Amino acid sequence: FVIDASGVLANPHTPKITGADTFTGAMFHSGHWDHSVAIDGKRVGVIGSGCSAAQIVPAIAGQVGRLTLFMGKAQWIIPRSDRLHGPLERWVRTLPGIRHAIRLLVFTFYDIRFVAFRRYPGLAGISRVVKAHYRKGLQKDLDTYVADEKLRRHMMPDYEMGCRRLIPSNAYLPALSRENVDVDISGIEAITP
């Protein structure tokens, strides 16, 4: 099987790969998932390393027999803020105006983070601090989950943070370290039957 995960947002992009029309297995784009295809115990290839792959790989890695991720350009993978909210936090959100205030704080945080990626005079220091923080965090995660040094180097983006969509995930890198998961960084020349 080959699952193409190289699309962009709501308009799926299927790359033109030599030999794709000769592939005899099931092949579909993640934006048009074919739920009739059984992948349990099968060899599956995922093309692309963006947000779709970061969701698909952890979701199916424990289900398939062997998974190969055909990785393209390195991506900025940042921690996803997944956590359970305690009873006090849930209760506070029921108070009038609190939900709106929390939403305003969240928007403000993301607006500040966005500004940090811009090169406005006077904000270069903030930008450097934010980028250094995320670079250090990604390097730590790569060191933790990716044993192969060459792959670690390939997975560290060589472009500025914020140039491409960030990938928030706590499951992607651990999934790539599973025994049944391989990462191929050699590039795809052709698909064979």
Model-derived segments and spans:
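A conserved short coil-to-beta-strand element within the FAD-binding core of flavoproteins
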Residues: S36, E160, V181-P193
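Rossmann-like dinucleotide-binding core of oxidoreductases
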Residues: D4-K140, T144
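Alpha-helical structural motif
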Residues: V130-Y134, L138, A147, L151, ...
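Internal nucleotide-binding/catalytic subdomain
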Residues: K150-R152, A171-L173, S186-T192
